[in-house]
Amino acid sequence: MEEKNKKGKIIIISGPSGVGKKTIIDQVINNVDLNLTYSISMTTRLPREHEKNGVDYFFVSEEEFNSAIEKGELLEWAEFANNKYGTPIKNLYKLIGENKNVILEIEVQGATKVKDILNREDYISIFLIPPSIRELKRRLKIRDTETKEKIKQRIKRAKVELKLQNEYDFIILNDDAKNAADKLRHILYEKVLEKK
């Protein structure tokens, strides 16, 4: 393959809220060999205390989000816990064109849409699972960003999402962040670098 024809791969990472997606991704994102970068999602939810606009998410109003949908500026979008989340197309394709391997940390609903749109050879999909629902609930509580009602909604949603894990190429158990990150790193070295 000629150098000019090379393009990056999309790495879809999903899992229930609180499973540790960001924690695991943060441990592998700086592996130089893998040439990884984040796709920054757009959301209507309010930022958490440590989050920055344009870094963690593009935080927008409901009106701005709906405008992006109408203009066809999102690869996918989904509604979760009364908030909308979506993947802006323009930046995603720019990064892939620069031969970057782009991590899409997205909800199951959004991942399904992306997999329906993309060519099969352009992505791999990975689903993170918790050791148990009890542990997932504990993680959501200690995160201390959700009300009891929101946690209840997220657990209910997690039970539905966990039933869809076999629709992904790989499943990683996150019982220990370091071990889960090592498994993710191994998968990426094997499946992303082999395509280069």
From Swiss-Prot:
Pfam assignment, any one: Guanylate_kin
Residues engaged in binding ATP: G15, P16, S17, G18, V19, G20, K21, K22
Matches recorded under PANTHER family: GUANYLATE KINASE, GUANYLATE KINASE-RELATED
GO cellular component terms, semicolon-separated: cytosol
Keywords of this entry: ATP-binding, Cytoplasm, Kinase, Nucleotide-binding, Transferase
Superkingdom of source: Bacteria
EC number in record: 2.7.4.8
CDD domains the record matches: GMPK (cd00071)
TM region(s), chain numbering: none
Reaction equation(s) it catalyzes: GMP + ATP = GDP + ADP
Role: Essential for recycling GMP and indirectly, cGMP.
Keyword Nucleotide-binding: yes
HAMAP family: Guanylate_kinase
Principal EC category: transferase
PROSITE patterns (alphabetical): GUANYLATE_KINASE_1, GUANYLATE_KINASE_2
NCBIfam families tied to this protein: guanyl_kin (TIGR03263)
Localization terms from the record: Cytoplasm
Record-level Gene Ontology MF annotations: ATP binding; guanylate kinase activity
Name this polypeptide is given: Guanylate kinase
UniProt cross-references to Gene3D superfamilies, sorted A to Z: Guanylate Kinase phosphate binding domain (3.30.63.10), P-loop containing nucleotide triphosphate hydrolases (3.40.50.300)
Listed InterPro entries: GK/Ca_channel_bsu, Guanylate_kin-like_dom, Guanylate_kinase, Guanylate_kinase_CS, P-loop_NTPase
